[in-house]
Amino acid sequence: MIGRIEGFFLKIRRALSRSEWIVRLLGLPRVKGAESEAGIVLIQIDGLAHPQLKKALKKHRMSFLNKLMQKEDYALHPLYSGLPSNTPAFQGELFYGIQTCVPAFSYQNSVNGEVIRMYEPEAAAAMQKHLAEEGEGLLQDGSSYSGIFSGGAMESSFCAATLNWRKNLHGANAFSAAIFILWNSWSFIRVAGLLILEVGLALGDFVRGLVAGQDLGKELRFVPARVAISILLRELVTMNAMLDAARGLPIIQLNFLGYDEQAHRRGPSSAFAHWTLKGIDHAIKRVWKAAKRSGARDYEVWIYSDHGQEKSIPYESAHGRSIEKAISEIFDQPHDDKISAEKGIQLQRAEWLSLPIGRWLFAGSKRTETSPTPETRVTAMGPVGHVYPGIVATWEERLLKAKEIVEKGKVPMVAITDENGGVYMINDEGRFQLPVDAAAVFGIDHPHIKAVAQDMVKLCRHPDSGDYVLFGWSKKISLSFPGENGAHAGPGPAETTAFALLPGTAPVTLPTNRALRALDLREGVREFLGRAPGAFPGRRRQKNRKQKLLRVMTYNVHSCIGMDGKLSPERIARVIAQYDPDIVALQELDVGRRRTDAIDQAEVIARTLEMDFHFHAAMQLEEGEYGNAVLSHHPIHLVRAAQLQRLPGRRILEPRGALWVRVEVEGLCHQLINTHFGLSRRERLLQCEDLLGPDW
């Protein structure tokens, strides 16, 4: 009865949902017939390291994420980013299964000699095309927002590879548009207030930049860029994801950039960067609730980050010259002072909105080449740079030049590769070969030392890597070649330690000797959606029991009708699979009844879970049966199935039955009786005495 009341109010709430009405008003296509099928929402918090998240949780910056762990059985795991520790490499691995798809955020194409910058649409689209040829897109038939790649999504917006955001207004008439604006008036007011607040914060930062002697025009551009990314883009992405949940898309992926934006500018642990996490936390709450209330699909929500950030010092601030000028002096070539160093990604992200302000912000910041001269080219965006000398040198010459870059150029680490593919790291302590000397290079206490060493070899062997690979991070210092206080892409412990906040029953195998990485998440998503071999949609299996236990589950399924009023034995099977039980005792199952589409619910659930079962009908009706069942993966034998006693003279009460089975597990026989007692105390006592009698 309580479930029916809750279901009634849920239907009312769904009927009044703004997302549902907007979908109708704008005529957006829906996925039909998928109400009981599994769906997943992937939420990425760009640039948030596992330690920074724990700090934010401790300071109550992300109260909703805390609630998920305390009340919704979510678990927090460290997640290794891979190398380079940036978004293109992480999304290449997650979306397409390809590790180290790029050698840096900016590099030279070995085929045509062009400089590639992954924030540029043409470059991102070309790499995405290559990835799609090598691996299957994870986001097929779904949507993707605010990333580098679309992941094969049917719909994508605000991505570097697919700049587009007007699809939701396409085809809407004036009346629908007016209703849309009125219905979301509070949201617009809220966004306006946040924009004003963020402008105030950004202007304060602008003044500090001028005092520090920064360029007026460039500092002025940062003000609307940060506002657009931290507030406007976040709200647009949130709204689109909520609409997609109402439409029933099978997979929805969205990326919140605000923290990463502020962390680059002010540092990963700065108060400004952590302030953005409160807004992100609230946005996640809205998306999570929209997904859970969706009547179009049975959604699960996973939350993760792609990488962290290292607190860094700008190279030019530390050494009084740009990395381009330093390299030109080392290679004895003239340097054009008009060619400035590469900037970070902050300004360029504003163009992803495809708004006039984005094009204004971007004006003058694009570069056709980042080099001291045409002979020697340097690409250095973030703490990883590549040097392309344009001349062939012997191994001995390259080794001497690498040492000179470290000693005279004050670059913390330089990697070079010999003719046999051996990778060597040069720093102020000497020359080391990877992966054997990983501890000497990265420190014995690095949390991902083995994986970092292996991925560093892959990065340096990438066909587009330079003859010299520059790293601003070392065990002693963290530099970034652009002017930024937070950086990532290198092998540092903070920048390579992201996080994954997953439901405790997510089908993700937790490695025993390493951290999770994007490939593990990818396989978990594929299994959850039924795309992996042998998987069924929605399987959420615990694969990591620490000890051998007999896990028994009891579940009153209420004829497989949920609180949302949807009939779905398959959804019941998904719930059971969450807990990976050895034995399942089910009550209130329908078999052949018109009210539940005349299906055998026990058989459907058992078949879906690949279990054997026994069913006993407590009630025999003309239209079918109603009763209890026991399911198990182990050999199961029926011992007894019979009706229980009823109160004399109270034939109106629902008849009750019991089902006794014997289950063999690893040579031991376990006895189990499944029943559903009556509602009154007298009735329950009578039925309990019956089970304690000689017949049982």
Where are these regions (language model features)?
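Active-site His/acidic residue clusters
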Residues: 245-279, 389-393, 496-497, 666-668
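His/Asp/Glu-rich, glycine-adjacent segments
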Residues: 2-4, 13, 97-267, 383-386, ...
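Secreted, luminal/periplasmic, and some membrane-associated catalytic domains
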Residues: 6, 36-38, 59-62, 67, ...
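Low-complexity, glycine/alanine/valine/leucine- and proline-rich hydrophobic stretches
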Residues: 448, 453-525
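A long, amphipathic alpha-helix that forms part
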Residues: 231-232, 236, 259-301, 326-335, ...
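Active-site-proximal N-terminal segment of extracellular/periplasmic enzymes that hydrolyze or transfer
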Residues: 5-73, 317-318
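Conserved beta strand-loop-helix elements of the APE1-like EEP
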Residues: 94-98, 148, 468, 607-608, ...
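N-terminal, active-site-proximal structural segment of metallo-dependent hydrolase catalytic domains
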Residues: 534-608, 613, 619-625, 668, ...
